[in-house]
């Protein structure tokens, strides 16, 4: 099953930027961008400075890059 693309990858591709373009424009390392896009590193746990720089380079809001967090509610045993 192919995993869906990260919001970061979708935003970057929408602007037809390469990962290298984004690294250069944001000042965030190419390796970090690759890891966020491949979900080897969680962008939600990245520094605000990094996410803000990436968002600025992609002309979007920080919230547009964060991945949804699934909340699991505890069910009480009946």
Q: Could you say what each language-model-derived stretch is?
A:
Residues 56, 63-78:
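Short, charged recognition helix plus adjacent turn
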Residues 8, 22-23, 33-36, 65:
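Conserved hydrophobic/aromatic packing and binding residues within compact polymer-binding modules
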Residues 13, 24, 56:
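Alpha-helical residues within the helix-turn-helix
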Residues 18, 29-32, 47, 61:
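Short coil turns linking two alpha-helices in DNA-binding domains
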Residues 40-56:
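Short, basic-rich loop-to-helix N-cap that marks the start of a DNA-contacting helix
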Residues 28-44:
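Recognition helix of helix-turn-helix/homeodomain-like DNA-binding domains
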Residues 1-16:
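A short, Lys/Arg-rich alpha-helix, primarily the initiator
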